Each structure stands twice: as structure tokens, then as C-alpha cells.
Amino acid sequence: MTFGWKLYGDGKTPPLGEAVAPDERLSWPRTVGIGAQHVVAMFGATFVFPLIMGLDANLAIMMSGVATIIFLLIVKNRVPSYLGTSAAFVGGVAAIRANGGDSSDVVGAILIAGVVLALVGVLIHFAGLGMINKVLPPAVTGAVVMLIGFNLAPVAAKTYWPQDQWVALATMTFVIVASLALRGFLARIAILLGLVFGYLLSVLLDATAGPITSVLGGATEATEHDRISFDTVGDADWIGTPDFTAPSFSVKFSLLVIPAVIALVAENVGHVKAVAEMTKRDLDPMMGRAVMADGVGTVIASAVGGSPTTTYAENIGVMAATRVYSTAAYYVAAIVAILLGLCPKFGALINIVPGGVLGGITVVLYGMIGLLGAKIWKENRVDFANPINLVPLAAGIIIGIGDVTLTFSDDFSLNGIALGSIVAVVAWHLARALAPADMKAALLREGTHPASGSTLGHGSDAPDPSSVDEVGRPGVTDGRTPGTGAHSR
């Protein structure tokens, strides 16, 4: 591994059809500019999901920078990626809080899941990806991703939406229109733009229509309140550290978030393959390292109260649009994120996002997460005419979405995402073992890549990053192999 990035040509924007490789860079001013684009790309989801999970958004942004640097070091600067907040844990976190857990319980459970993810990465590194494909075929992976997303429907419907239904409706509508009407990079940040729109709309309504009467999150009775209050912003310091939270550990709560590991493995593998396709480099030897690095990043972030991390499709999209794959730009983005995390006033501004705005955003995001499970099925040609796929996965999905509970004792039970995921995995393998030979043979015609195209919970409205050219038009994949341009050494 080296930090001595080679200067690409004269350090200016690469010509049409050429690209800047991971071990190259443009001039430092241009590299800083590319890094700024990566900050904007990751920003929306990186602070929206901590807010939804009840964690400190400022700390999440800061630790995303730390996790990104750790990731780049572990993969030896060969896999350019940014680690932002993962959406895969939102359902498990909601279940923890519904069962009386607090933020310490949440980050403790996430830390355990991070350890499991890191161990899976080690297993992939030494045993190969084939073992994971056997345990978690696309049919099962898609089912787990789907139940994670759709299990969250009551959170959006009962917690956020009722706080301000009209702002929620307006925000949701804006996100839908923006994702369709805008093009290129702006379409990829439709969620962030929707949040800004809802934020400003709430300020305008407070000024013109006055306070609103509704039930705030966690309350049982309706009260009159402003949609947004800037008191905490005025009281916050300009420079300081975020609020840290020490983790506490519980087997019950850990089991609620461990199913997210399945989604993260699929997501990481899919993203590494997308980067490999764009850079025209063989990154299969880095697959295990990338998964392990994501796990390590999650462990370190959650150890101080931060959010879980994952590689971001939005940032892969920025690389596809600019054809600048330099890891130097990611170090710049990570440093900027760390500095933003050290500004409490910035964090206070984030933490006062109105509940109605989150209501409009979450109905879109949670639905997108669930439908990405169907995307995995489609891209891997999963055959639901085959009872091996249809029957066990149907049971697992309904158990997960319906929040069915299996009680073992007064102190221990499984429900929702955890129980649904276990049923989906175990019942599928049991059905496969008991099925006649012709049903087993039909499975061989399905795809074998559990992560094909999956981008869990963010960036899914963007085109496939591996088929976007330098100006963001989908479907153009030609161009020279990165690293073939002239260098100044």
C-alpha cells in the first residue's frame, strides 16, 4: 500500500474516454473538488438514517470519515469507496427500541453485528465467496432484504407521518418528482433535496400558519408545538465533540440486528463488483477484505455511539460520472466529514429536522429497501414457480413483516426481522434437502450472485454505477482502462 499517488497527466480533468485510477490523482485543488462531491453524495443518507434510528447524526458523520479511512487502509487503497450510515439496521433498531432498549443497547447490538460481519469477511477471504453463495443464495438474500424494509412500515406510518401529515405528504411528493424529473447527480441526491425542501417548508408554515397540534414521537397525547425550533442551534458551540454513548450488550437485542449482516454482505459484494467493472481491475482478492473492513468500521463507530457503516452506491455513482477513481479524493471526503462532526452547531441544525419531514422521506426509503429484495430476485432469475423458493420464503417474509413473536421464556423471545430471517434461511435449506431431484435441478438455472446490483437503502434511484459514463448517461461502458494515461512521476 502506498500514499504516493501518481499525478495523472497534467493533473487536469481526464479526456473523454479516459479515467484516473485508484493509485493516481488529479492536482490537489481538483482532488479536493472531487472529494467535496463525495461529501455531498454521502451526506443525505449518512445523517438521515441516524436520525431515524435515534442516534447522534453529527457523531455518525464524523465516524463515517473515520470508518472510511480504516476501510481504505484495510483494502490497501485498491477499492475506492466511502462508508456512510447503513440502512440495513433501521428495522432491527426500531425493534430494539420497541422492546424497551435505549441508545446504549442499540449501539451494543450494532457492535456485535459488526464483529460478525468482520468474521464473515475473514471467512470470505480464506474460503472464497462460493461458500457464502451456498449458505445465502439470491432467493434467501432477497427475502431477508425485503422483510427488513417492509417490517419498517409501521414506524413510518405511526411514528413520523402523524407528526405533520401535510408536510410529510409534500415531502414524499417532492422526492418522487425530483427522482424522476432531475438528471444525473441531482437525481441521486433526491432524498437530500427532499429533506431540505421539507425543512424549509416547515419553517415557512411556522411563520405563516403558526404552531401545529399533533402527537410527537414517543408521546401519547397531542400537544401544540412549532414544527421546528432553532433554540438548540443557538445554544450549541461552533467547535466541540459530539455526544458519545457507551455500548451495552444483550443477546436478545443482538439477535434483532444480526440479520442485517446478510444484507451488508450482499451489498458490499455488489459494490466491489461494480467498482471492479468500472476500474477494469480484478478486485475479487479484495472481496473478503472489503467485507471485513466494513465490519471493523461498524465496530469502531458503534463503540463510541456512532451508526453502522456500509459502502455507498451514491459515491460509486460519483466515480462513474467523473471517471475519477482516485482514493485520494476519498481521504479528502473523510477528513471533511470528521471536521463537520467536530462542529456541534452543525449537528444541532441536523437534529431538529421535523418529524413530518422524516415521515415523507421514510415512506419512500423503507419501501425502496423492501423492493431491493425483489430486485435481487429479478436480477438472479429466482423462480417462484419452484416450491423450494415459494413456500419457505413466503413464511419468512410474513413473519418478518407481521412482527410475529416466538416466546421461549419470560426473558427471551424472537420476533419480526430476527425470527423471519431465521425461518427464511433454515426453512429454505430444509425445503431444498427434502425436495425431489427435479426441483433441486431447477435451482441451478437461477443466478448465483446474491448481491447482483443491490444498493440497500440509498442511491437505488440512480442508474447502475457500472454502466454510467463520464457525464452520467446510463448504458455507456466503453473507454480506456484506468491507469493507461500519461503520468508525471
Positions of PLM-derived features:
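Terminal cytosolic tails of multi-pass membrane transporters
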Residues: 418-489
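Juxtamembrane interface elements at the cytosolic ends of transmembrane helices
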Residues: 9-10, 15, 43-46, 174-178, ...
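Membrane-embedded alpha-helical modules
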Residues: 100-208, 334-442
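Short, non-helical or kinked segments that cap or interrupt transmembrane helices
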Residues: 55-61, 77-90, 132-141, 187-193, ...
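Membrane-embedded helical hairpins/re-entrant loop segments and their flanking transmembrane helices
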Residues: 18-32, 49-72, 256-327
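Interfacial segments of multi-pass membrane proteins
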Residues: 93-99, 179, 315-330, 336-341
